[in-house]
Structure formats: C-alpha cells, structure tokens
Amino acid sequence: MTLLTQSSTWQALSAHTQNLPHMRELFATDAARFKNMSLSACGLFLDYSKNRATAETLELLFSLAKDSQLEAKIKAMFAGEIINTTEKRAVLHTALRSKASQSIIAEGQDIVPEVQQTLSKMQEFVETVTSGQWKGYTGKAITDIVSIGIGGSFLGPKVVSQALRPYWNQGLNCHFVANVDGTSISEKLKLLDSETTLFIMSSKSFGTQETLTNTLTAKAWFLAKGGLQSDVAKHFVAVTSNVTKATEFGIDADNIFPMWDWVGGRYSLWSAIGLPIALLVGMDNFRALLNGAHQMDEHFASAPLAENMPVIMGLLSLWYGNFFNAQSHVVLTYDHYLRGLPAYFQQLDMESNGKSVTLDGTDVDYSTGPVIWGGEGTNGQHAYHQLIHQGTALIPADFIMPLQSHNPIGVHHDQLASNCFGQTQALMQGRTFEEALAELANSSLTDEEKQLIAKHKVMPGNKPSNTLLMNKLTPETLGALIALYEHRTFVQGAIWDINSFDQWGVELGKNLGNDVLARISAEQDSSALDASSNGLINLYRQGAI
C-alpha cells in the first residue's frame, strides 16, 4: 500500500462511505443544506449540495488535503518551484495572467516583463490586422485567419473563440486546423481566398508532425494560388521557440511570438497561443479573459480550503473516483457557446492526471484521472443522460449555465434553465417504486403490468452533481471558469502525488508514429514488428484489403 492509502484519513473516508444517507434524506433533514453547500467566487456560483456528502465528509476530505500538503503544493506552484519534476520545469501558466506590477521568478529571472512585452506585441499585431492596415500580397486586407496547431495550441484557442462568438470583430473569421488527416485542411482551404488569408502556425519546435505538415500544405496552396515565396511573410506568422526554422520557412522575425518551457501546451491559451482569440475578440476582451483567470488564481491561492472552489470540486471528484469506483465524470454545458468545453476539460484533466506512478516512481494503488466526457444540454438529455439516471455506473456530473443568454428569444432560455435544474433534481431525487406505481394508478394496465412497468420506471437517484452558474458568459467569467478547472485538476494530482504536468504517453505515441511512418514509406523493413502492426502496414502499402 502507498502512504496515501495507508493514512488514517483515507481509511476513515473508506469507512464513511457505508454511513451516508440517501441525498433525499439529507435534503429532508437539513433546510439550510443549499445555503451551507454553495459559494460564490470570481463571478461564478457553485452549488455542491447535490453531492453524497455531509459536513463530516467534507471535514475528512479537507483533512486528506492537509495530510497531502495541498496548501504547500499550491504555494510551490505559484512561487515557480520545479514541480514538473520529470522535465525539471516550473509550472507558471498563472504568470501569463498576472498583473504587470507582480514579480514572478523562474530560473532566476523575473518573467513578468517578458509576458507583458509579448502582450504588447500581440496588441500591436491585432490592431494592425483588425484595422485593415495589414495587407496581403495583392494589397487586400485580411478577412480570414487559419490557426494551425495540435493539442493545447489548437483546442484552447478554438474552444475559447467559439465561446466568445458574441464578441467577435466584424469582418474577420477564423478556421482551426489540427488533424493531420488531409481532409481537414483541404475542406478549410476550399473556403478561403489566398489574397486575404493569414495563417498562424503554433508549434514550440516548429517541427510538430501534424502542425508542420498542415503548414507546408497551406504554404503549397498559397504558392499555387499565385503567391510568391517573398509574399509568405505577409500571410504567415508563428508562435514558436524555434526562430531559425520559422524564418527559414519565410516568416518575418518580427512576426514570431514566443513560447516558454514553463507553460505546458494544455495551459497555453493565455499566452501568444491565444493570438487567434485576440484577433477575433480584440485585446481588451483578451485581457478581460486573462483577468478572470487571474481572479481565480488569487482565490485558489488565498481562500481557506473549506471556502476554496477549485479545492471543493477537486476533492468531490476524487471522493467518487477513489471511494465509489466512479470511472468517469460528465461535463454538461447548458449554453450553446460553451459546447466545446467538455472536450477542452477532457484534454486538461486526462492528459494531466492520466498517470500511474507517484512522483518518486511508486506504482499507485488507487484510481487517478477519470474519463472526462460530456456535451451540450439539452441534446444529451435525449441520449446519454439515460445512462446517468438508470445505468449501473456512478457518473458524477457538472452542470454549467449562464443565468442570462446572449440571445434571449421568447421562452428559450427559461426552458433551457428548467431542463438544467430539473436534471440535477432528477439525478438527486430519483423515483421510488411506490412513486412509479402511483403514477400508473389510473392507467388501463392490469395490476401485474403496473407492477412490472413500475420496476422499469424506478430510478435510484442519489446521483451526484455540481451546478455552476454565472450571470452571463463574458470573457472574464470564461477565464475564471477555465482557471477553476485547471486548479481543480491540480488539486487531485497533488493529493494523488503524481506529476500533472508531463505527458509521456503522448510522447510515446509521437515516437512510434514517426517510426511507423518510416516503415510505411519503405525506408525501413517492418517485418521485425509484431505481426499485427506488420500486417496493417503491409495492407496500407497495398492500398486495398
């Protein structure tokens, strides 16, 4: 057993699972439960009263956090200590949204001035493009941005841009390309005019396979449409650490934006990786996004554990994963603009906490990162909500909704809100056999049929959920929401004693993919591989089954 599972608090939590009443009873016996199990921070409101938790549960979870030195680990991250131990790096995405007056040291150097310089450079670039001063090779202004990246350099900008659609500058559109499947970029290029398109290539090394391949394809398309090599600088910019490769490609050194080792890809939208966001919504709104995240940073760093929103959410998710064998967690967004968030949180959480050894290399003997999935309300209610209500697996849920809509048409938002709140009530309350039978009392069914149908209509309830509300979806509330989930992820990794900031599984996949590519290209013999891989490669070479 690991030190974590040997601890008295862990053992107490395990025993405590046997003594919890149904949530129906918890609400029936405590009129103040909603008031006592909800809090506001940074423009967000969290109702966590519909959880399998009592005051004793929470005290035990806070004790577990203290046993795991969570508060010290939070301070270590904000102080720029080397908490990504396998790569010997600080973890300072929080510095990207810090105030100019702050001083944050990484590798013996204050990094805030460089962050502020980059923001100023972004502002100048954004104003040049959005004002129409930036001209393409035929003298026309830019109308379309194509953001080329992969992983964090793709998903973050795409999801945030999608979420902030009401704030977009008129006359500018953005397209996101990540997948190396040629169909993805081909379909995008069909929509574009080479004279008015600007490509943003985001890759720390300027060599990420998918990103480089897509960028080379974009360049070939641009040249085929009439552009010259000397025109590339008017239509391509880069976010990269490899200035040499970018300039060799044809990008002007003045149009290369930096990336830093102390920012992981899945935490990078706050940096120049967010350039597509800034172009679409303007720098004032981009800074508001940063400010919302900064407010959540301040809350996370200073609020007591019992009043700390990321801590509470992280602990409750851990509670279900480690003590109720919950293998997944669903994120349900009741706002069309937020429909991309489940995929973003999926990458954030699963890439961070999909680990199986502790910091000192010991195999864990407890579950770590759950499968994060979800979708858009109310669509999911007519699909996978059925599994959450009546399936055998326990699936904790987060419901996210703004109180005010950007598009208040008729009764739409009232119906959306009623569905959101109704789902959380149904998950908590369920339906007993007696209630189901009573509903069938006036039907024409026989007594025997009523008994049978009632059994099928029973729902156990006691299904946990959090509800997150905001007044309205704005750049600031969105920034706070994303930072909330970043810190929630950190909380769990800190307690599990794993490194939430490396991704060796991703790296292995890259390496093996390159190896297979060489074999597909017949540069290497594939016969030494396992029979399955060799057989698949040979079928691909043949081009037919």
Curated annotation (Swiss-Prot):
Q: Spell out the subcellular localization from the entry.
A: Cytoplasm
- Give GO BP annotations, semicolon-separated: gluconeogenesis; glucose 6-phosphate metabolic process; glycolytic process
Molecular function (GO) terms listed?
Answer: carbohydrate derivative binding; glucose-6-phosphate isomerase activity; monosaccharide binding
Keyword Isomerase assigned: yes
PROSITE patterns found in the cross-reference section: P_GLUCOSE_ISOMERASE_1, P_GLUCOSE_ISOMERASE_2, P_GLUCOSE_ISOMERASE_3
Read off the InterPro entries from this record.
G6P_Isomerase, G6P_Isomerase_C, Phosphoglucose_isomerase_CS, SIS_dom_sf, SIS_PGI_1, SIS_PGI_2
Q: Which UniProt keywords apply?
A: Cytoplasm, Gluconeogenesis, Glycolysis, Isomerase
Q: Which residues form the active site?
A: 351 (proton donor), 382, 510
Q: Which domain of life is it from?
A: Bacteria
Pfam family name, one: PGI
Question: What is its pathway?
Answer: Carbohydrate biosynthesis; gluconeogenesis; Carbohydrate degradation; glycolysis; D-glyceraldehyde 3-phosphate and glycerone phosphate from D-glucose: step 2/4
Q: Which GO terms describe its cellular component?
A: cytosol
State the EC number(s): 5.3.1.9
Reaction catalyzed = alpha-D-glucose 6-phosphate = beta-D-fructose 6-phosphate
Query: Where primarily located?
Result: cytoplasm
Matching entries from NCBIfam families are given as: PRK00179.1
List, alphabetically, the HAMAP family matched.
Answer: G6P_isomerase
Q: Briefly, what is this protein's role?
A: Catalyzes the reversible isomerization of glucose-6-phosphate to fructose-6-phosphate.
> Its family?
Belongs to the GPI family.
This protein is called what? Answer: Glucose-6-phosphate isomerase
Which gene does this sequence derive from? pgi
